[in-house]
């Protein structure tokens, strides 16, 4: 097979991969526009008939209707796809460990779940702008986010590097990133880690480590969607793709003939949080109720069952306290 045919086959393969995670044509055929500074991208409504955990027998908390975006519903902002935590099933419904957790929280508050698919780097602005009640979207807890919202710990994950099968650029350590291209989603902690932003301001991040040592800078390639960064790796536009460990592991497990993890190079185990708007004087009713519902799930084992369903139980937490 000649090189042009190989490239075409590769592109078709990755298209099938991404489609398997986001198969709803209504959501995926038109790319989301990049918001201009100061603007919030309008969240895209997605179907909400996703499989949910079995109904609970009792409601553990309530939220006044006038505090909800839509009465009777817990509206969740999430950046889809980001499997296995949030993605679309074959029928175009949102699913994943984060989505199932959100559904069960809503259930325990006597509510139905609604999902708004929202660009990740505008997701906090969407919450603060009244587009949703909470965010469940694999958000790492950091100081910059805590200055804007309150966050309830619900998971923990590291950061991993995915490379093409055979690791053609021989990336084994962070030093090997110097002078190479790295694909990453905008607004993520991984992007901060590369650029020396957020919680990595003090150390300067991975790029500064290269330049301070007299080595070539990392060629950081930011993408609006995590799936775009994966596509860049598949089409050889970047040497590696930097993302949360559960997401990296998912893609490698699903397509072991195309991708592999950089063994032994998992960085920064960080807790992820459910984001809620800050209350005017202490925690809001939404924060208190969501926290109570989540802790009840942890205590009765439902939470761990959900994580185990998606093979991410290694990221389980035992408490909703920081």
Predicted features along the sequence, with ranges:
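Bacterial lipoprotein signal-peptidase II cleavage site
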Residues: 23-31
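Immediate post-signal peptide segment of exported/extracytoplasmic ligand-binding proteins
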Residues: 30-32, 41-93, 169-171, 175-181, ...
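Extended ligand-binding regions for polar small-molecule ligands
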Residues: 54, 99-108, 165-168, 175-189, ...
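Extracytoplasmic small-molecule ligand-binding "clamshell" domains
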Residues: 57-138
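Periplasmic-binding protein-like
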Residues: 80, 155-163, 214, 249, ...
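Short helices/loops that flank or line small-molecule/ion binding pockets
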Residues: 103-108, 116-117, 121-134, 148-149, ...
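A conserved helix-loop-strand patch within extracytoplasmic ligand-binding domains
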Residues: 111-112, 119-122, 139-140, 152-204, ...
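A ligand-binding cleft/hinge motif common to bilobed small-molecule-binding domains
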Residues: 121, 139-146, 194-197, 234-269
């Amino acid at each position: 097979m000649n090189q042009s045919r190989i490239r075409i086959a590769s592109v078709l393969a990755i298209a099938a991969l991404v489609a398997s995670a986001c198969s709803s044509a209504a959501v995926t055929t038109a790319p989301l526009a990049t918001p201009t500074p100061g603007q919030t991208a309008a969240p895209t409504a997605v179907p909400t008939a996703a499989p949910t955990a079995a109904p609970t027998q009792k409601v553990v908390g309530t939220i006044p209707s006038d505090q909800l975006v839509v009465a009777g519903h817990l509206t969740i902002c999430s950046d889809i796809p980001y499997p296995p935590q949030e993605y679309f099933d074959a029928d175009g419904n949102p699913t994943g460990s984060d989505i199932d957790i959100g559904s069960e929280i809503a259930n325990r508050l006597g509510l139905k779940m609604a999902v708004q698919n929202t660009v990740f780097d505008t997701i906090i602005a969407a919450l603060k702008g009244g587009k949703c009640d909470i965010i469940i979207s694999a958000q790492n807890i950091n100081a910059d986010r805590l200055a804007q919202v309150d966050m309830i710990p619900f998971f923990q994950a590291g950061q991993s590097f995915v490379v093409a099968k055979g690791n053609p650029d021989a990336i084994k350590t962070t030093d090997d990133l110097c002078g190479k291209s790295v694909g990453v989603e905008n607004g993520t902690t991984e992007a901060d880690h590369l650029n020396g932003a957020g919680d990595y301001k003090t150390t300067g991040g991975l790029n500064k480590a290269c330049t301070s040592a007299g080595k070539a800078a990392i060629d950081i390639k930011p993408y609006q969607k995590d799936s775009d960064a994966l596509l860049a790796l598949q089409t050889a536009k970047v040497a590696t793709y930097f993302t949360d460990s559960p997401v990296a592991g998912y893609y490698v497990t699903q397509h072991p003939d195309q991708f592999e993890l950089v063994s032994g190079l998992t960085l920064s185990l960080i807790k992820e949080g459910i984001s809620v708007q800050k209350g005017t004087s202490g925690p809001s009713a939404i924060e208190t109720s969501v926290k109570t519902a989540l802790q009840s799930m942890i205590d009765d084992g439902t939470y761990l069952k959900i994580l185990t369903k998606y093979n991410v139980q290694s990221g389980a937490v035992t408490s909703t306290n920081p």
